[in-house]
């Protein structure tokens, strides 16, 4: 039974990101951008696209074709 507690602690430590490392939130943002029919643009959206969100805090934008 103690082994279960130890494995649980290692699982929690593995999933909690280190300070400055946003792997899990960044991946989730990209995933939700794709679900909404968008793509992650590096700097700006193209002329025929609109911004519907953000893919990261560093400036990547989630863009989708205008309706």
Swiss-Prot record:
It is found in: Secreted. GO terms for cellular component: extracellular space. Residues 1-22 form the signal peptide. Gene3D superfamilies: Antimicrobial Peptide, Beta-defensin 2, Chain A. It holds the Pfam family Defensin_beta. Disulfide bonds join 33-62, 40-55, 45-63. Its main location: secreted. Keywords: Antibiotic, Antimicrobial, Defensin, Disulfide bond, Secreted, Signal. InterPro entries: Defensin_beta-like. GO terms for molecular function: chemoattractant activity. The keyword Translocase does not apply. GO terms for biological process: cell chemotaxis; defense response to bacterium. It comes from the Eukaryota. Has antibacterial activity. Belongs to the beta-defensin family. This is Beta-defensin 14. It comes from Mus musculus. The gene is Defb14.
